């Protein structure tokens, strides 16, 4: 345990302000893994603590706890694990000027139960997870004297909640112990504003201020409340008299802001500040208290299909924030960290963030307010948490009210959901949702994501409606599709956890895990790859699988945008998810740094407030066909596109324009998806295989799509005296090889023992979801002469669709180490077996090429497969086909069914 020995620790009370005392700094400290101190007033357990720690921090920062020897496969490994009570202590001199005031001990963020002792007496305990802990200590503190304040933070599970809740799971942010953010004593006069909520009314250009005033004097207090509203080039003052007769008095005041109010939204995140000063007197004694909050003039309603903000439909383009913070192990509480994350979010054209089964600290709300990001917030609730358990239910009831009170004024807080994929007693979920709607109508509410709807739902995050499956997790080899027929169910539907296509881990990231968690699972993955003699290909696997995931995201997002009846989508996620099996599904790493797979500028071509869209039926065509495109525009930007010029063009791989045209200049509406017109291009002038790019620009926005054009081929796979084409490895093929000739073996996929072949890379991650075939794309050895007449990159793209969907993956663990397939399928990182669809080898005196692709099924409708076979034919009939790696006949027979 790294800790300093304390000689004396007395805090004299250097307050930042006269009514606040900053308590950050050194505290006496002691762990209590056996829980000896809890609830005991025995003198043995009330001694001065002998170690020290500096707050705000967490125990992991000081290497406190059990040093883990493990290498967790399914998550990052916490280096120093501590779960249990930890004690913090300081002697503090309470200012004499605080006599007669109410005194609170404030922790901005802690985890999970905090208990406070003054001297030997336990005086307060709080178990919120989502909001600050504010302990009133008035009764036990004596201004002008030194007091020994001890508090205990217990990060054990206080209730039987789901172990994956992102608020306290080791799978995301760690289950830390400590205090973060502000730690302070606060003194207020006995008549003070306990709560102040601002309710905007944009129709009447006014606000309603709802206040809770506490009077602890036991006498009537009379005075006034002074309101001061400021904004951009705006000031308003108002005073109202007030009489506080009871211990709690509720006050409402309406304020007209004027004719020219500034609304808050993603494009114009205008903010106002309300400063309130309560001055009062009781029996000649004067009191004063000030409270401030920011707010935005915005109203949220549930439309038929979309969320309505300030009277206009919006469309959410979001990601899920899963509390992944490997640098610190906890969610940051400072503005700069959240501003960075949310600016990156907006840089990628997104306007929305869902906090999956957790609620962020105030800094996240402040920065979302500032930058114009729509937030959906949840409690730490998941799975079985709705099953009957009154203690747990009461915790959720308190947590809900706390979240609404603490963060309710933030205009970015437009959506609330109880939690993730909840099961159990949905009458309890309905109770929570109905209660929230009754308490605070400033946002929309939903019972749960992706499970059963409840009566009070105002929106629903799901992949399934009563009309069918409307989730979108991968693209298709065409773009003329959407999910509109599965929608139109009477309330806004947001697509649940879209995307989730796995990328091979980038082992270069391992050096970045310098905080309380380490990527020791990467060590296991790397060792497996090394054991299978492919470590030199690790970065190629990352690049190839990552390129495919980026391609998938473009198609997933464009399909979401074409689905005009959908209220929005949430990716899972823009950055990697480090738990539940480790899911590297993001185009950003866990630290929100780029992986180098796609630039923000390119991403914004298909994910932005305004996006040009194109519907077409094929990505791979013959040159006797006509490409036909139907242009659309997704426009949820701030304005109409007046007199928008619409241009299209088709270019070859060198950027040369082959054909261009214009569609009708028109004014495009906003808050919807609008058809623009059609165009076509006859491909008969394309005589050689080509990759073409279709470009579409609408006013200032542009987008593009790749297509592949091939000539038709007949008489494919024709054997000669030197080259034998066959689907079976029979005696004829063996003799051909023994004679020093060439054989091309294309076994039917049903005759290969290996895995299913698919275009898409694995969903989510292979450790949690062990769904076959457990592959994550292909590495194409495009520099080899076999691809001289087949256009490809090092990764698969849409021209590979019909090839891969009609193939079989050969498991090649018994192949010679040096043998690398030219179509190399990337195995999941928890296995790292060598896999292939096509390879070549020397067998006896001959040369063998194996291609585990169905070369007969609907071959006239498969232009890319035809072209691959043509390229192979030219290759094997040339001198370039000269395999150097030798395999036995028995190896070939080992992966073929008899």
Please tell me what each predicted stretch does.
Residues 439, 749-753, 765-863, 880-898:
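Catalytic beta-strand/loop cores that center a nucleophilic Ser/Cys/Thr
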Residues 30-34, 78-79, 83-193, 216, ...:
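Accessory beta-strand-rich segments of carbohydrate-active enzymes
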Residues 142-146, 214-301, 678, 685-716:
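Extended acidic/polar, glycine-enriched regions
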Residues 439, 572-637:
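Aromatic-rich peripheral "rim/lid" segments of glycoside hydrolase catalytic domains that contact
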Residues 16-106, 162-172, 176-179, 578, ...:
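Extended carbohydrate-recognition surfaces in non-catalytic/accessory domains of CAZymes
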Residues 116-118, 206-243, 251, 626-665, ...:
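Beta-strand-rich binding/interaction modules
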Residues 62-94, 98-118, 124-127, 190-197, ...:
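Active-site-adjacent substrate/metal-binding segments within catalytic domains
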Residues 342-343, 352-588:
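Substrate-binding/catalytic cleft of secreted carbohydrate-active enzymes
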């Amino acid at each position: 345990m790294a800790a300093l020995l304390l000689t004396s620790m007395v805090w004299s009370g250097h307050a930042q302000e006269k009514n606040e005392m900053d308590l950050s700094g050194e505290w006496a400290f002691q762990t209590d893994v056996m829980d000896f101190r809890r609830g005991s007033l025995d003198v043995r357990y009330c001694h001065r603590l002998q170690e020290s720690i500096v707050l705000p921090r967490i125990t992991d920062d000081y290497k406190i706890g059990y040093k883990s020897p493990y290498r967790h496969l399914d998550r990052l490994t916490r280096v120093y694990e501590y779960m249990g009570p930890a004690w913090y202590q300081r002697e503090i001199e309470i200012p004499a000027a605080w006599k007669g005031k109410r005194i609170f001990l404030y922790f901005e963020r802690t985890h999970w139960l905090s208990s406070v002792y003054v001297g030997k007496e336990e005086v307060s305990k709080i178990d919120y997870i989502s909001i600050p802990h504010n302990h009133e200590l008035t009764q036990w503190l004596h201004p002008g004297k030194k007091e020994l304040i001890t508090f205990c933070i217990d990060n054990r599970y206080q209730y039987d909640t789901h172990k994956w809740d992102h608020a306290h799971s080791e799978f995301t942010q760690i289950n830390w112990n400590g205090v973060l953010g502000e730690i302070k004593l606060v003194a207020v006069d006995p008549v003070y504003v306990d709560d102040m909520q601002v309710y905007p009314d944009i129709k009447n250009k006014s606000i309603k201020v709802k206040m809770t005033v506490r009077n602890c004097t036991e006498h009537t207090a009379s005075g006034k409340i002074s309101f001061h509203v400021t904004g951009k080039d705006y000031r308003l003052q108002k005073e109202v008299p007030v009489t506080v007769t009871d211990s709690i008095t509720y006050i409402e005041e309406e304020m007209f802001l004027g004719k020219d109010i500034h609304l808050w939204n993603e494009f114009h995140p205008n903010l106002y500040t309300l400063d309130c000063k309560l001055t009062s007197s009781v029996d000649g004694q004067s009191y004063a208290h000030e409270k401030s909050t920011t707010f935005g003039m915005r109203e949220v309603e549930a439309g038929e299909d979309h969320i309505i903000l300030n009277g206009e439909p919006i469309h959410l383009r979001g990601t899920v924030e899963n509390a992944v913070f490997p640098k610190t192990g906890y969610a940051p509480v400072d503005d700069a960290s959240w501003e960075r994350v949310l600016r990156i979010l907006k840089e990628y054209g997104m306007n929305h963030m869902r906090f999956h089964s957790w609620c962020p600290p105030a800094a996240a709300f402040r920065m979302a307010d500032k930058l114009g990001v729509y937030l959906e917030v949840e409690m730490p609730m998941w799975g079985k948490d709705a099953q009957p358990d009154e203690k747990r239910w009461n915790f959720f009831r308190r947590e809900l009210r706390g979240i609404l009170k603490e963060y309710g004024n933030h205009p970015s807080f437009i959506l609330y959901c109880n939690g993730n994929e909840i099961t159990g007693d949905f009458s309890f979920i309905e109770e929570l949702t109905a209660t929230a709607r009754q308490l605070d109508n400033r946002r929309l509410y939903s019972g749960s994501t992706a499970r059963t709807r409840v009566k009070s739902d105002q929106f629903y995050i799901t992949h399934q409606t009563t009309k069918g499956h409307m989730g979108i997790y991968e693209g298709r080899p065409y773009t003329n599709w959407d999910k509109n027929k599965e929608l139109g169910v009477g309330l806004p539907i947001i697509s649940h956890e879209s995307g989730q296509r796995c990328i091979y881990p980038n082992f270069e990231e391992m050096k970045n895990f310098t905080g309380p968690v380490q990527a020791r699972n990467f060590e296991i993955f790397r060792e497996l790859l090394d054991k299978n003699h492919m470590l030199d290909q690790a970065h190629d696997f990352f690049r190839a699988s990552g390129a495919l995931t980026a391609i998938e995201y473009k198609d997933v997002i464009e399909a979401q945008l074409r689905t005009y009846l959908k209220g929005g989508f949430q990716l899972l996620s823009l950055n990697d998810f480090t738990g539940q099996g480790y899911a590297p599904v993001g185009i950003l790493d866990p630290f929100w740094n780029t992986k180098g797979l796609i630039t923000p500028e390119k991403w914004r071509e298909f994910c932005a407030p305004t996006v040009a869209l194109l519907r077409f039926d094929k990505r791979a065509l013959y040159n006797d066909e006509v490409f036909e495109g139907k242009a659309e525009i997704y426009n949820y930007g701030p304005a109409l596109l007046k007199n928008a010029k619409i241009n299209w063009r088709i270019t070859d791989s060198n950027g040369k324009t082959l054909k261009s045209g214009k569609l009708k200049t028109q004014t495009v509406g906003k808050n919807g998806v609008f058809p623009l017109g059609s165009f076509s291009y006859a491909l008969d002038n394309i005589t050689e295989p080509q990759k073409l790019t279709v470009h579409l620009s609408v006013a200032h926005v542009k987008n593009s799509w790749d297509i592949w054009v091939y000539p038709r081929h007949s008489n494919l796979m024709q054997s000669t005296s030197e080259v034998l084409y066959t689907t079976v490895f029979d005696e004829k093929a063996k003799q051909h090889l023994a004679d020093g000739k060439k054989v091309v073996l294309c076994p039917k996929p049903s005759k290969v023992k290996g895995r299913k072949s698919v275009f898409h890379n694995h969903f989510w991650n292979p450790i949690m979801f062990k769904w076959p075939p457990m592959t994550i794309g292909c590495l194409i050895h495009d520099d080899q002469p076999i691809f001289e007449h087949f256009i490809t990159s090092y990764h698969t793209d849409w021209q590979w669709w019909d090839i891969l969907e009609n193939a079989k993956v050969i498991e090649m663990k018994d192949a010679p180490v040096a043998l690398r397939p030219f179509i190399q399928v990337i195995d999941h990182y928890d296995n790292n077996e060598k896999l292939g669809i096509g390879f070549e080898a020397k067998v006896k005196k001959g040369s063998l090429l194996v291609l585990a692709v169905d070369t007969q099924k609907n071959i006239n409708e498969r232009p890319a497969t035809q072209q691959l076979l043509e390229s192979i034919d030219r290759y094997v009939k040339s001198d370039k086909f000269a395999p150097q790696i030798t395999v036995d006949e028995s190896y070939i027979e080992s992966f073929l069914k008899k």
